Amino acid sequence: MSKAPPLRLGVNIDHIATLRNARGGRHPDPLRAAFAAIEAGADGITAHLREDRRHIRDADMQRLKAEISKPLNFEMAATDDMIRIALGVKPHAVCLVPERREELTTEGGLDVVGQQASLGPAIARFNDAGIRTSLFIAADPAQIEMAAKLKAPAIEIHTGAWCDAITDGDAAKANTEWQRIFAGAALARSAGLEVHAGHGLDYATAETISELPQIVELNIGFYMIGEALFVGLGETVRAMRAAMDRGRAKAIAA
């Protein structure tokens, strides 16, 4: 039997804030969603404070840090302003992501190789502050190796291309992307990085990727918030947790 570590579920609540902001005001409250997710079994809460504040706002991050009982993962672009805000909030972790104002969601992985001169000092500042840093990257060997060189504690593998290929019915592309993820997770772990994954995951893909023993955390948001409209957030978190547990059980039995 292999030694697969426990697998954490981070619930991204950005799109609770998207719905709130569509009408203004305070309802629905992202903090209430965080409480519900944690009660249902989430191991942490993820929120992305974008530069345009299109969903999560500064006050949301402060409230989440002050009131939730589980770790807060602060997704952010590595800008001077966001670094200053994150150091003030002092979350358990930050996940550095690429960001473009015109995108609907994070479209690709961070170019760690191309941005090493700016990312290195940012990672060092967070490490010094006791805030764990992960880098949201494609499962590309050069990016993974640079993440390790810059002393990032963790990476989050971008699973979007794999999930999109499955949704589109493109089996060949899905297999190619899966092989990249499979190899990338192994390379990252051998380089001493903690390995997370996320973007576009649903119940089926979360179960599949949970079979990779190197991965210790999945961060999932949009699919779960969509499902919650029909069955409730608590039930969605429990169903996702069950899917992950089924996948991890296969890894342990292998």
Curated annotation (Swiss-Prot):
Catalytic activity: 3-amino-2-oxopropyl phosphate + 1-deoxy-D-xylulose 5-phosphate = pyridoxine 5'-phosphate + phosphate + 2 H2O + H(+)
Residues that hold 3-amino-2-oxopropyl phosphate according to the record: N12, R23, G200, G221, F222
Active-site residues (renumbered): H48, E75, H199
Tagged with keyword Isomerase: no
InterPro entries, A to Z: Aldolase_TIM, PyrdxlP_synth_PdxJ, Pyridoxine-5'_phos_synth
Gene3D superfamilies: Aldolase class I
Pathway(s) where this gene product acts: Cofactor biosynthesis; pyridoxine 5'-phosphate biosynthesis; pyridoxine 5'-phosphate from D-erythrose 4-phosphate: step 5/5
Localization terms from the record: Cytoplasm
EC id: 2.6.99.2
Lineage: superkingdom: Bacteria
Residues the entry annotates as binding 1-deoxy-D-xylulose 5-phosphate: D14, H15, R50, H55, T105
GO biological process, one term: pyridoxine biosynthetic process
CDD domains documented for this protein: PNPsynthase
Oligomer and partners: Homooctamer; tetramer of dimers.
Family: Belongs to the PNP synthase family.
Function: Catalyzes the complicated ring closure reaction between the two acyclic compounds 1-deoxy-D-xylulose-5-phosphate (DXP) and 3-amino-2-oxopropyl phosphate (1-amino-acetone-3-phosphate or AAP) to form pyridoxine 5'-phosphate (PNP) and inorganic phosphate.
Descriptive protein name: Pyridoxine 5'-phosphate synthase
Name of the gene: pdxJ
